[in-house]
């Protein structure tokens, strides 16, 4: 027998700044709900990686229209939690620090946002999805049944990012917590001040401060909210 969550799948939009816990929360939540997880940040990182690999960054800084040609041929897809760019698994490559430094700029470009918005909206047509990013609740799915906006103190977010990088570094040097905190603060400024789809909370979004929360606590809060919405729809 199907549960209410399976009978009436909804769209869960999770927004927030870098390292606020969006992706981890969204992945675990989607698995728990039996929903599809779509990592929009990975999509922007994939475009950024392609720009860097093709050596187009300086050209695009001078002339943003140069990116349009690249977007015509790019393919981005997911298999489970693996990310594929033009058929290649780039799940680790898109997390490189050089990508992190440039993704805010690439994300600010209108042709990029238009192209990825189209892809993301197509992915969400069947509902039963959890999507995280920076403009999901405001631009991609403003009518999502549940919109969450995660925040956390920049210092705490830097510690999380540092721990994540150490885990993946295999003994290689990683940026200091202090350097990462400055990078995160700059990223916040870039995301909030960009012309196209700046980072902001939708008026209907539930604000959740994750500074002192574990991942399990974050997931439980959002899972309970999904249940409440589905139960109300079933009445």
Swiss-Prot record:
GO terms for molecular function: ATP binding; CMP kinase activity; dCMP kinase activity. It is an enzyme of class 2 (transferase). GO terms for cellular component: cytosol. It comes from the Bacteria. CDD domains: CMPK. Its EC number is 2.7.4.25. It is found in: Cytoplasm. The keyword Nucleus does not apply. Keywords: ATP-binding, Cytoplasm, Kinase, Nucleotide-binding, Transferase. Belongs to the cytidylate kinase family. Type 1 subfamily. This is Cytidylate kinase. It comes from Chlorobaculum tepidum (strain ATCC 49652 / DSM 12025 / NBRC 103806 / TLS) (Chlorobium tepidum). The gene is cmk.
């Amino acid at each position: 027998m199907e549960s209410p969550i399976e009978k009436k799948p909804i769209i869960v939009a999770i927004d927030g700044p870098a390292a606020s816990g969006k992706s981890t929360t969204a992945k675990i939540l989607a698995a728990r709900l039996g929903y599809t997880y779509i990592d929009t940040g990975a999509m922007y990182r994939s475009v950024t990686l392609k720009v860097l690999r093709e050596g187009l960054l300086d050209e695009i800084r001078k002339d943003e229209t140069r990116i349009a040609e690249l977007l015509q041929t790019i393919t981005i897809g997911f298999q489970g939690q693996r990310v594929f760019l033009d058929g290649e698994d780039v799940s680790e490559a898109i997390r490189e620090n050089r990508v992190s430094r440039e993704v805010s700029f690439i994300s600010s470009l209108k042709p990029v946002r238009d192209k990825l918005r189209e892809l993301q909206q197509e992915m969400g047509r069947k509902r039963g999805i959890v999507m995280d990013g920076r403009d999901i609740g405001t631009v991609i799915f403003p009518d999502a049944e549940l919109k969450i906006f995660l925040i956390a103190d920049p210092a705490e977010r830097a510690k999380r990012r540092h721990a994540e990088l150490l885990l993946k570094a295999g003994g290689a040097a990683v940026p200091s917590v202090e350097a990462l905190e400055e990078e995160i603060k700059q990223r916040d400024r870039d995301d909030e001040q960009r012309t196209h789809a700046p980072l902001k909370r939708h008026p209907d979004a539930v604000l959740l401060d994750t500074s002192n929360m574990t991942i399990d606590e974050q997931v439980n809060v959002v899972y309970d909210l999904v249940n409440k919405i589905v139960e109300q729809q079933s009445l």
